[in-house]
Amino acid sequence: MIDAHDIRFSYDGPGGRRSLNGAKLHVAPGELVAVLGHNGCGKSTLVKHFNALLPLQHGTLTVDGMDAADPDNRWALRRKVGMVFQNPDNQFVSTIVGEDVAFGLENYGVPEAEIPARVAAALAAVDMAGYENRATHTLSGGQKQRVALAGVLALSPDILVFDEATAMLDPDGRQEVLHTIHRLHTQQHKTVVMITHYIEEAIGADRVYLIHNGKMIADGTAREMLTQPE
C-alpha cells in the first residue's frame, strides 16, 4: 500500500543538509507499522511525504498505486492518508467539537446533508459519541487527540498516520489514544503508520522500522528490535 525507496529530502532544497538520506519503507494493506527513532532523525519528514504535505525531491513513493511525485494526485493522497499530529490544539479550527470534526468535509465533496451523520459516526468510532456540542476547551488531552482523529476519520481514509500523537499526553491520555489506534486497526482493518520514539508504543506493531540520521538502519518485529545490539 505504501512503497518508499531512496527518499532524500532537505528543507533547504536539494543541495542542503538532508533530513532524509535514502529512507525506504514498505507498508502492506492492513498492517500496523511503527517508525521508531530519536527526535530529529527524519521520522516526521518521511511521513509528511505520504499525503503530499512535503514535495518529493528524490526517490520514488507510491501510495495505493498513486505516484506521490505527481502533483495531480495531491488531493487524492490527502483523502487517502489521514494524519494526526503531536499537538491536538494546533489541529482545532473551532471551539465546538462537532464543528471541528466537520471542518473541510464540503471541500472534499461530502454533501452537506451527509455531514452530521459522518460527524456522529466518526465520534462514535473514537468512543466520544454525543460530544458534538461540547466545547473543546473542556476536554482532556486524550479526548482532544481523539477529536482530532475523528476529524480525520470523517473523510474515511484508508491509511492512518500518527505523528508522535501521544507525545504531549499524560499516561492516561496516552493509553486512551493507543487503545483507539489499535482498535481501529483490528476492528476497522485500517492500515496504520505510527511514528514514535517510545519502544513500548511499538510493541503491538506488525513491523518496526528503526530510523537514524534520515536512513532506515533496521526493521523487524518489536521483539527483534528489543534484542538488537546497540
Question: Predicted segments — roles?
Answer:
Residues 59-69, 77:
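Conserved ABC transporter NBD signature motif
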Residues 113-131:
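Conserved ABC ATPase "signature" region
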Residues 36-38:
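The feature captures the beta-strand-to-loop junction immediately N-terminal to the Walker
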Residues 135-139, 143:
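Conserved ABC ATPase signature
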Residues 215-230:
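Conserved beta-strand-loop-alpha-helix hinge in the C-terminal portion
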